[in-house]
Amino acid sequence: MKKDSESNSSDKSNKEELSTGRRGGNPMIIALVITVLAAMLFFNQPEPSSLISASFFRSQLEKNNIESVEIGDIEVSGTFKTRPQMPASESADGDAKPKELLKRFRFTRPAGADYAVQLSEDLEKRNIKDWKFSPPDNTAAILNLLILVGLPLAIFFFIFMMIRRTRNDMMGGGFLSGFSKSPAKRFEATDKVITFNDVAGLEGVKADLQEIVDFLKTPEKFQKLGGQVPKGVLLNGPPGTGKTLLARAVAGEADVPFFSVNGSEFIQMFVGVGASRVRDLFKTAKEQSPSIIFIDEIDAVGRQRGAGLGGGHDEREQTLNQILGEMDGFGGAQAVIVIAATNRPDVLDPALLRPGRFDRHVTVGRPTMKGREEIFKVHVRDVPLGDDVDLHRLAAGTVGLTGADIRNMVNEAALWAARGDKKIVEMSDFDYARDKILMGAKREEVLLESEKEKTAYHEAGHTLTAWHLEGSHIVHKVTIIPRGRALGVTQYVPNEDRLSMSKRELEHQLIVLLGGRAAEKIIYTETCVGAENDLERATSIARRMVTHWGMSPKIGPVSYKTSDEDPFLGREIHQQRQFSEHTQELIDEEVARILMEADQKAEQLLREHRGQLETITRELLDREELNEAELTELIGPSIHKRLGDEEGKVEQIMAPEGAAERTSNASARRED
């Protein structure tokens, strides 16, 4: 069987090569023809000659300086015995200076029918034997005929061939046929098989997909009872949570052909190519059913129709219409399941989400602590670990990270250990990798003493407010070493896997965010641009409290959608604002009030603990980095220690670094 398949593939490749040769021609033959034509044109160039007058020719003839003559209908040409000097008065081209002529000459034959006869007699008298009459030259007439007749025929033939080739392309052949072919990649049985055992931390999602696997294995079990399997499964969730891996695991468990394609690959520069590719993909999948079609990033082609600025007839919408038609056209006996993945289900067209197309929606969220520990176990299978590596502790300190983040963290730890010529990966390597991913790599640069001191006070303000506020996040580490684009970082350990927060906790979060700015005001009586990122995040939280979560007594329990939430410009243009200008003013006033109150409380708390603020700042300037244990030695146990609330996840707040300060991914995910 293997030999047969190899021979078949060889025959197929040979046919493809032959067909390619027929379409495009053999490059060697084309190059040879071009070379021969170029050589013919080069070697057929006439020998250069000097243009003279008939009188000068007559004078040279009398001086017996003519070696050969060729008499034509239009011109007389020949060669001199010696190269003469032609006076300016005799120059046929109007040259004002005497010049030495070339060996060969030519001049226009004078009018008169008997000139040729008379010239031939003169040549015979002077005993010049090398002369002749040249035959008529019809080259010019032939060229004119080719230009007048041949060129229009060539253009007509070219247009005819293009029309014929375009028709072949529409039927699936020709040199453009590759554009209409589906770009989907098929994963064969020889590829690495992914099963549910390779997917960790998503037990609930795997249970939802197990029914799909059962249908692909034994479809008659469901069809016998009149049941129909979902035609489509939509996996939605943040990037890196394992949506593609889950789709491949479904195919691996069911042992069926798996076609994978990205949504953006359907769209090309030619109109209709996307729809043609969709038809080809579904046709191939139906021929090999039962099978799975996986469309990654389906929001690239499945966005809501009519929401953009391009109208309703662009290439993307034609492709979407074809997908909708193909998913409706499945017969009951065709075991073809479409699995799609997106992290923006809110922008998809409603027709794509209705029952009968994507019947089942599966949310693939970030893993819990138990799930993260299982993911760590999967990714450290081939990594030699030290005895001090505690996967449970790593899982507890990486809340909010996805499977892709954890994989990256394990890889960074292995690279760091290899850089130190270690034989195993130790816990310190994982701590380094976690800090690098969450806070950024350390920057080797020397700060001015004034900047370093201001950064220390800023970070101390964040640390101290979180240290004394109940319900805030546990301080894990604070540093004034520049990392990434930040001059300093305060790293927190919030409560584990929390999905909701109270108004009081949000207010405390605002106080902590504004703590760095408040510390600068207390010490320097002014603030710097380093608090830009803190203000952005605090403003976002306060605005959500007012417009989304009904936490403003003045606005009340109402949800207002603001324009910055629209995923793209077209959708915002087509929608109208749901509230008046007066309501917008009230929203702005309430947001400002909440932030002002948080700022005042942060400043009041820091003034009450001014001594601890100075202590933390002094130690930061001395050590540059303090962890939770060292902070406890300096200022006593935090409120979290006293209340026994010590479980959590890692988050960060960036310190001043100017307008370019950034927010870490982990922090931004939690704040949103």
Curated annotation (Swiss-Prot):
Disulfide bonds: none annotated. Its EC number is 3.4.24.-. It is an enzyme of class 3 (hydrolase). GO terms for biological process: protein catabolic process; proteolysis. Binds 1 zinc ion per subunit. InterPro entries: AAA+_ATPase, AAA_lid_3, ATPase_AAA_core, ATPase_AAA_CS, FtsH, P-loop_NTPase, Pept_M41_FtsH_extracell, Peptidase_M41. Residues 662-672 have a biased composition (Polar residues). The active site is at 459. Residues 1-22, 642-672 are annotated as: Disordered. Residues 1-23, 163-672 are cytoplasmic. It is found in: Cell inner membrane. ATP binds at residues 237-244. Keywords: ATP-binding, Cell inner membrane, Cell membrane, Hydrolase, Membrane, Metal-binding, Metalloprotease, Nucleotide-binding, Protease, Transmembrane, Transmembrane helix, Zinc. One of its GO terms (molecular function) is metalloendopeptidase activity. The chain crosses the membrane at residues 24-44, 142-162. In the central section; belongs to the AAA ATPase family. In the C-terminal section; belongs to the peptidase M41 family. Acts as a processive, ATP-dependent zinc metallopeptidase for both cytoplasmic and membrane proteins. Plays a role in the quality control of integral membrane proteins. PANTHER family: ATP-DEPENDENT ZINC METALLOPROTEASE YME1L1, METALLOPROTEASE M41 FTSH. This is ATP-dependent zinc metalloprotease FtsH 1. It comes from Rhodopirellula baltica (strain DSM 10527 / NCIMB 13988 / SH1). The gene is ftsH1.
